[in-house]
């Protein structure tokens, strides 16, 4: 059997599929390589592009769907710990999206045969941006994030965001697939034939090498936007290593004891701390609610203990907690509305009675925190509730806190995975980004590093220091250029006191045009596919339908 025939066989397609899934998962943080392997990312998509090239139309849809389900299933396996339904939802939607994407890749290659390499690369990049949008937005798995530790290369994100890094990572896969595909389809497969296939794409390869070289040299020469600190701030990041989802007043009291112990340890050794940060939902009882409505005496008492504790200190506290209000329904009844909140308490100012500055989480996790289609799909909403989904109301205001002259914002949980959110905070005056998260439920180091990899890009894009206080990790301090300044050991209680640089100037092209490059990839790929389809139809009409 010839190599080309073998590659087009079911066994060949299956092996390409397995290789594609494996390389995608290994490129990003995973159980085998908790920090991922950045080098593998440059060829991770080549097996998929070859599979699309050689498979028939129906097979392309099948393998695309299978690739979506298995690649994202392997990538985000930790969702199973949260709930099997969550993993099924991600795998299911990924299967649908990748089936459609692979069909688009096949069409793009057929419509623009001579330029198939660039067209397929563009279509993939357009997909990566599109999959971060809307209710189903899922930024995990963007290829650019695999390079989070390659600091000289990713400094270009300060101008064009993560999308330019993705372009640099995806192109070699498309190039390699094009060269290998051309070589396999030759009648003679020897070194000369391979070099001939590679030579036919030498211009695009040279441009890619030049762009990568420029990015690295520009970083070494300091050409990218300046991130010189004007002042510094000392922040205590508390990592209790608990699990707020356990529930029960005794569990909440035990977590509170751990939080206060770690905070006291930090404040005794570093009395000049500017801010103490507790993670997302670190204190579960609704502070303002239980202080106002004292029906649950044990919760009220725990709230009083918290307020007395904070008011006795000499520095502000950011506390991740539930926040609730009474709201009148359309039927005229009153109901409680819950928010996932970050609360700023300043001792002697807004602690007793509690009237903290508030930020309510705007970008909620689909299906597990938020489902806006209750009236359209009431049966599915009820199903999610029975699966222990915790629904929150959606916040609407981008809040910039201010304490001791420091202006900062607090993206909650996976909000630091979306560039437009942190960009908006910085546009409104934030000079420090403080992320509070709870990834403890996943019990996965690779999950925590996947989250961290995206946070690194948010720091670079905005040229702002970003600190993370996470329940079980990764609790880190990130410099404006993406360097990890310090990091706590994961899955252990501790507190990280970080002295971080504060940049106040508006610097970096990303601050001005945001995700414009991602939008361009998306719009351009749609235009090229439509133009290619029209061009193909016109040619068929001229040649006669057969």
From Swiss-Prot:
CN hydrolase domain location: 233-502
Record field: transmembrane: 14-34, 41-61, 62-82, 85-105, 122-142, 151-171, 194-214, 514-534
Record Pfam families: CN_hydrolase, LNT_N
Pathway terms, separated by semicolons: Protein modification; lipoprotein biosynthesis (N-acyl transfer)
Protein keywords: Acyltransferase, Cell inner membrane, Cell membrane, Membrane, Transferase, Transmembrane, Transmembrane helix
Domain of life (superkingdom): Bacteria
GO molecular function ontology, one term from the record: N-acyltransferase activity
GO cellular component: plasma membrane
Places the protein is found: Cell inner membrane
Biological process terms in GO annotation: lipoprotein biosynthetic process
Keyword Nuclease: no
Keyword Ligase carried by entry: no
Topology in the lipid bilayer: Multi-pass membrane protein
Family: Belongs to the CN hydrolase family. Apolipoprotein N-acyltransferase subfamily.
HAMAP family: Lnt (MF_01148)
Biological role stated in the UniProt entry: Catalyzes the phospholipid dependent N-acylation of the N-terminal cysteine of apolipoprotein, the last step in lipoprotein maturation.
UniProt protein name: Apolipoprotein N-acyltransferase 1
Source organism of this protein record: Treponema pallidum (strain Nichols)
